[in-house]
Amino acid sequence: QWMGANGGLINRKDLASYKAKRREPVRTIYRGHEIVGFPPPSSGGVHVAQILNILEPFDLALMAPDSAEFVHLVTEAMRLAFADRAHWLGDADFAAVPKGLASKKYARRLAKKIDPTKAAPVDAHSTPSNAGTDLFGKHTTHFSTADTEGWWVTCTATVNTTFGSGVVIPGTGIVMNNEMDDFSAQPGAPNVFGLIGAEANAIAPGKRPLSSMSPTIVLRDGKPIFTVGAAGGPTIITQVVLAIIQVVDFGKSP
């Protein structure tokens, strides 16, 4: 009622028809560690896995983490992944999101594009094998926790930008989000974070917008050893990748 009286478009039917969905996580193996992340419409699971897969052929442990060599290599891998994000990623219930984006074979192809001596142009996205058939069916908070019974939780929640839409429905204390900005208003038009999207993330009824949330669990020998997530819009993906590298490649404690 309040939304209708104040120019909003959301009605009771919209709220009643919204259902939380259980989805299969994105999984990859990075140097003997199983990386388990969230699938589309979050781009985090796909591209955390993709970036780590691109970097796996390189022996990062031999590099200083603050060296130009390390920074260049990781940056180039991230650029390749974000080019794919802009083209392919969206709600997999509406868009054809290739599972091959997180495959080892595809990552090896992308890794060969990295020139260790200079930044290479990334003119467009690449295309993984079976892209048409093998598909996936700033004001952010992340927390990770575990209990004595062995349950591990990694959770990211967001209202998108600072204070979301800037609206609090009287009597609720709830800040309404502005997640509509995470859709691509039109192909090639940046959102508030400067991210470019394509038709895969176009607005449609009942569709969920693309996000960068990356709640991740890392396992070794089938047992969880740490969880990781972050806040910060598109930098969530890169922060999570760097945290995993620090633990797996450089031996830092979780």
Indicate where each model-derived feature is located.
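Alpha-helical support elements that line or immediately flank enzyme active sites
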Residues: 1, 53, 230-252
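Long, well-ordered, tryptophan-enriched scaffold segments
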Residues: 1-39, 60
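Internal maturation/activation junctions in enzymes
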Residues: 8, 57-159, 171-172, 179, ...
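Active-site rim segments in enzyme catalytic domains, especially the processed small/beta chain
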Residues: 9-11, 151-220, 226, 237, ...
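Short, small/polar residue-rich loop motifs at catalytic or cofactor-binding pockets
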Residues: 22, 137-140, 162, 211-213
